[in-house]
Amino acid sequence: MQFIDQAEIQVEAGKGGDGMVAFRREKFVPAGGPAGGNGGRGGSVVLVAVANLQTLLDFKFQRVFKAENGKRGGPKNMTGAGGSDRLIEVPPGTMIYDRETEELLGDLVKPGQTCCVAQGGKGGLGNKHFLSNSNRAPEYALPGLDGEVRMLRLELKLLAEVGIIGLPNAGKSTLIAALSAARPKIADYPFTTLVPNLGVVRKPTGDGTVFADIPGLIEGASAGLGLGHEFLRHIERTRLLLHLVDITDVDPVENFETIQNELEVYGRSLEDKRQVLALNKVDAVDVKGAEIQELVNRFREISGGKVFLISAVAGIGLEELMQEIWGLLEMEEEVKSSELTPTPPLVSREES
């Protein structure tokens, strides 16, 4: 399936139904008063987040969405039927912007959340509303109002708990394939991954955590070079970053610092996210050699934390790495829970 994370669409709410001109005509009331009903309200356009969607691909083929118009008012003061709303399904994580004003209209994070993006027009008033002392038989009614028309920009940010970042060819796709049932395209050359890949990694308890293989970032990504902005955007919602560095590269330390700099320059608190550092492809080097040991110590000094030596291909060190990630996620969950739990009020002995 092709991954599309941005789209532009036009939404048109329904027009309100026209009010009706009608008069009461019954057997013993040959000249009754006005009885024209109001027009029905036009349908609105509503976006709804649906769990089984992961891309905005559908909007590549359909870009205009219209709600139903309201029906005309009827005789005997009957209000016309309202137009049906138009529901547009989007994946969770979709942000909705007005294309002209760039106003954020909605951020649909959870399945079932909705956002009304275009209100249907009000129905026109029937002639019963224009009865007055000077006009006992008004022969006019109001037309329904037009519904809202908007151009929208949809932007999808992946809802992954762990984002795997690193330069191209660091082994991110291989790692997510080793940890989950995801099968991303893998090859031994840079930029194999051109779109984010999602994989669900299972804990020993059976619970799943969504990992996102973010396509390889390059120097200048924060300024939009390559597909930098598109890729960095997907990191914003993650709870934890797994920074993967190719230990066999010419200068792994420089590669690490390049990515850290891009996160800092891009801003939006990306540089403050908790990170786990893993040096990949250790099956291709002598991990006990002095050169590698010196490199690992250097990384410990720079990152100020643990450094994991892994091989996504050979499965080396993956269990220890995952234990660290599970522990950090659980710790964060506990902190969040404690912040949400209200502190019970103190009761003095006199009050008790």
From Swiss-Prot:
Domain of life: Bacteria
One GO term of the biological process aspect: ribosome biogenesis
UniProt keyword Kinase, yes or no: no
EC number: 3.6.5.-
Binding-site residues, GTP: 166-173, 191-195, 213-216, 280-283, 311-313
Principal place of residence: cytoplasm
Domain Obg: 1-159
Residues binding Mg(2+), per UniProt: S173, T193
Cofactor(s) it depends on: Mg(2+)
Limits of the OBG-type G domain: 160-330
Any Gene Ontology CC annotation: cytoplasm
Record localization: Cytoplasm
Enzyme class: hydrolase
UniProt KW keywords: Cytoplasm, GTP-binding, Hydrolase, Magnesium, Metal-binding, Nucleotide-binding
One Pfam family in the UniProt entry: MMR_HSR1
MF-aspect GO terms: GTP binding; GTPase activity; magnesium ion binding
Matches recorded under NCBIfam families: Obg_CgtA, PRK12297.1, PRK12299.1
Its biological purpose: An essential GTPase which binds GTP, GDP and possibly (p)ppGpp with moderate affinity, with high nucleotide exchange rates and a fairly low GTP hydrolysis rate. Plays a role in control of the cell cycle, stress response, ribosome biogenesis and in those bacteria that undergo differentiation, in morphogenesis control.
Annotated family: Belongs to the TRAFAC class OBG-HflX-like GTPase superfamily. OBG GTPase family.
SUBUNIT field: Monomer.
Protein name per Swiss-Prot or TrEMBL: GTPase Obg
Organism, scientific name: Trichodesmium erythraeum (strain IMS101)
Taxonomy of the source species: Bacteria, Bacillati, Cyanobacteriota, Cyanophyceae, Oscillatoriophycideae
